[in-house]
Amino acid sequence: TGTMFMEKYPVQTTLTLRHLREFWTPQVRAGLRNSVLLGLGTAAVGTALTAAAALVTARYANRAARWVHTLSVLLMAVPGLVLGLSFVLAFKGTALYGTVWILILAGVLHFFTTPYNLLYQSLQKLSSELESVGCTLGIPPLRLIFDVLLPQCAGTLADMAAYFFVSSTVTISAAAFLSTASTRPLALLVVQYSDQLNLSGAAYLSFLILAVNLLARAAAALVRRLVRR
């Protein structure tokens, strides 16, 4: 990261702030906006879907739940490159192709397993009698989920959202096949600058990604701290 403060690394290592102004171009601003939108969308959609899957598999013992659990774990075995190429073949020519939504969908599937396992383990630690008590008291299942189960795992949900956000903003495997000029995230611009031997520019973009991800992690830590009070 220090190379962005050097005149021309590694030829001229004089310290300068010139690059900070030069690299703040419309292309970089668009890439930053795309990365934030991608991160927020993946965090929202991914957290919702993984929460639904974990609730089904951790709290209900039936054949459908076992299938959902198996598929959720198997998603980890799919490489990002394979996922990206599969999406190109499946969605090319559709309205979804070339939009940020296809990047969000790919990101959710790519990073699904780890957040799923986090919430799955948290839900299994809760008493297995909660559903029986709720049924006895006449509490609707959805109310039990939103008023009891999910609030008990609020810190885990925040960590899941942060994981989706951070992972989606730094990945390049699936995004390399699915992004267009208007949806290209900063991570791909880092690769482009690096290939052009523009190391200062690549370092600057990497620093921007790091700063955004630190904010996401700080927000998750704040939520977890508030939950513990």
PLM regions: where:
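Hydrophobic alpha-helical elements at and bordering transmembrane segments
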Residues: 1, 28, 32, 36, ...
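A structural signal for multi-pass alpha-helical bundles of membrane permease subunits
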Residues: 1-8, 34, 84-95, 106, ...
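Interhelical loop and adjacent transmembrane-helix boundary motif
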Residues: 4-8, 12-27, 169-221
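Membrane-interfacial helix termini and adjacent extracytoplasmic/periplasmic loops
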Residues: 6-10, 14-17, 22-26, 60, ...
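Transmembrane alpha-helix signature in integral membrane proteins
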Residues: 26-59, 64-67
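Loop-to-transmembrane-helix entry motif
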Residues: 27, 35-39, 43, 71, ...
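Faces of alpha-helical transmembrane segments in polytopic inner-membrane proteins
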Residues: 46-49, 72-83, 96-120, 140-143, ...
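C-terminal transmembrane helix and the adjacent membrane-cytosol boundary/short C-terminal tail
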Residues: 55-63, 120-130, 135, 139-148, ...
